């Protein structure tokens, strides 16, 4: 009798556990009304931003592309557009056009996104490939007070890490530094903006070390690839990559005044060689940039190799009387010229983006 009682008790216990587990699974799989409302709001805000980026007006024929870009189905997008129209954010006709109210809301989102992206670039350890998606998630939730704290910390930046202008608190926009110029062989250019919408192309650009404010020397270009000289090294990229770069032309003298012809990345410095630092790469940002500057890797400092580790990485460098070990992925951001190359007074005085 006791065994029957225990069996019945255990059966009821496990049955209750099973039903509790099933209820938990159902609740986890079904978003709450609050979550559904937040999602609807985010979809609408994403569409406002998309229309704003398109110039404030979008033809109906572009809806298939919008659904692909925003990863939405037709019903979800249609519901979002209807809500925006009812809220006075959008006028609906042959084109979807932002009202003044809708444009203001879109610019506030763009401001939140670009401020947070700049914050990630300067004060986080996240890779550049992660900045955009993290900022995209945060733009819907970051408060105005939080934005202002970031702005104060960052020194009121005008541009985000890719070169896109950040709307001011009054939603005024700094001039976009985008250009439509195509490079020719044996010409010099400054990168004003790097587009990160295409993840594959953006990753290829990052692998070369290119970033906003980088100066390149285009060597050759054809239908498939173009080659260029950058920080003492020669690279090749698919020609379509140029579509993600906005370039400002420079003369040879202007380019060499910033970065002398002999410039190389410090991890190439040999055991018995000495060099003079001319700056840090534009791709070096945030905590690493501040650390290298604090360690004495500033323009004009003399540097030599004290010792290579048995595996070649890290390397100990002597700078300003101190021996400092750096990995290759750190030393590559330090740009130098041979110590025998004193440079002209023009080279000595050039700075801008170096430090």
Regions found by a protein language model. Give the residues of each.
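Short alpha-helical segments that sit at the start of domains
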Residues: 17-48
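Short acidic, hydrophobic short linear motifs in intrinsically disordered regions
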Residues: 57-69
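Short amphipathic alpha-helical interaction segments
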Residues: 71-86
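A short, conserved structural fragment
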Residues: 85-95
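Basic, amphipathic "hinge/linker" alpha-helix immediately C-terminal to the N-terminal HTH DNA-binding motif
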Residues: 95-113
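Mid-protein regulatory/catalytic core that forms ligand/cofactor-binding pockets
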Residues: 140-280, 288
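Structural motif
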Residues: 214, 301-302, 322
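Short, basic, low-complexity termini and linkers enriched in Ser/Thr/Gly/Pro
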Residues: 344-355
